[in-house]
Amino acid sequence: MRTLIRFLILIALGLSAAGRAQSLPVTVMPVTARHGMVVAGHPQAAEAGRQVLQAGGNAIDAAIATSLALGVAEPYASGLGGKLMLLYYESATRRTYVIDAMDAAAGSLDVPAYVKRPAEQHAYGYGAVCVPGLAAGLWMAHGRWGSRPWAEDVQPAIALALAGFEVLPKSRDFFEEQAKKLRRGDAEIARLYLPQGRLPDAGTLLPNPDLAHTLTLLAQKGRDGFYRGPVAAAIAAAMKKGGGVVTADDLATYEARLTDPVGIAFRGDRIMSAPPPANGAAMFLAALKVLEDDSFDAGPLRSARNLDRLGRVWRLVEPQAYRLIADAPESRGYFEKMIAPDSIRALRAQAGALPVAMMQAPSPDQSALAATTHFIVVDGHGNIVCATQSLSVHFGAGVVPPGTGVVLNDSMSNFEFSDPKHLNYVAAGRRPRSTISPTIVFRQGQPVLALGIPGAARIPTSTLQVLLDHLVLGRPLAEAIGDTRFHFVIPWKPGEVETFEAEQSLPAAQAAGLRALGWKVVLPEAAGRGRLFSGVNAVEFNPDGTLTGYADPRRTNAAAGY
């Protein structure tokens, strides 16, 4: 199915594919189109969005179709039971908006009682579930900017849920990885995703009639089709039975937020990304400011010397962002202080002052592995949706309320539980932080690049390396995305060793050089597997008015345009 869809996209629609990037660990095949582009985490979702664009829908209409189809085709990564952070660039006004539809803790949460629960209950089962935000976020986007009837935008996801999505080989990897969770005890999730009690084979079509019914109610009644009525009642009943804390009132009163992005000036460009409670942008934007004047010896970025430079900076900005950026009114001010000239000069001096082993350890904190997906939609008017959506970890809390077909998030696990003074400490109605970082780059006021990536703590480091490779070292995006992916694991306890992680395509000489500089080097994954280092999705805006989509094959990503 995936091969067929890509063939139809490239051949039947008359698109051009740029040449392959040579001698790279991962080959990224750019797809260029003139009228519209969708890049998404599954080819059937990308195609759903493309069809909406070609039928006359705008970027928001196609984004709704793409988002909901992703929830069908990547049930381990995102969906109605999870969260959404959406950047929208409106070309007519040249303004960028953000819809924060992040999951929220229950409004009536008894914090002292919840904190005393076993840690496992913060991460699995109904007790781990926050109020989902995705449907409310899409509804808000449609109400402000959609051009077609809401029901028409939802219809492609309904059709996909009825017909079944194709389990691709890399999709099956995630099913296999989460087999224990799928078999753990929730009968509904096992029924849906372990047909006949077995992991689905690649090529299997997996329908979800219950989810199709939920989507039909959403199409008919708008946000109330999910947050009120029979779906909400089913969720609330399952929560009560399963020890959850989310009530029908919590669902009915949830609201997405319309807000503004955070951003920096960088070498004449303007880079905008996700605001608090997301903290990933604070990390890579601050790092970019520290490194703004660095030439990296004209490359390559992945030399031991340059990687050590990046790691020293990351060692400083990551703990700041975890400490200061959360769902708190003061976090925007903290971000502005992080990127203020005096702060950047101090960070630059500190990063170069000491061997990495002598740098002070940050305050203890934690960062979870996550299940996330990213998509980008650009329409013929130049409007852009750049959005990341997530269940927190793969298959979320591992539960599906009977009759709904909806996998619920485990976002309660993203809160801080040990320090009541921490900005991310669990609280009623608070939205837990996340590293998700949909990003748009502007040059002379015009968009030149939109990108995003799933991957939890690796989201901001991956975004940083792609931007540095492309914007500073001038590498084509296909090369920046296809080269060896890496990440810095910063210890949270004094005495722990700084760890540099990379795909196994990292040259041995550079690994040895990093070890000599004090880094522990771990190469956990072959290049292109995408389980840890995930896949970047991007759209480039070309001078001739065409759009080039980049779908990282580390995952099941696909680009579709016309």
Residue ranges, per PLM feature:
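Internal maturation/activation junctions in enzymes
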Residues: 293-391, 404, 411, 512, ...
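Short, small/polar residue-rich loop motifs at catalytic or cofactor-binding pockets
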Residues: 258, 369-372, 394, 434-436
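Active-site rim segments in enzyme catalytic domains, especially the processed small/beta chain
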Residues: 72-97, 245-247, 383-449, 473, ...
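Extended C-terminal subregions enriched in glycine
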Residues: 430, 463, 472-529
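Bacterial N-terminal signal peptides
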Residues: 6-16
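Short, well-structured alpha-helical segments that form the helix of a local strand-helix-strand
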Residues: 62-66, 151-162, 234-236, 301-318, ...
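Noncatalytic scaffold domains of N-terminal-nucleophile
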Residues: 22-47, 51, 59-221, 226-228, ...
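Short beta-strand scaffold segments in enzyme catalytic cores
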Residues: 78, 82-90, 373-377, 438-440, ...
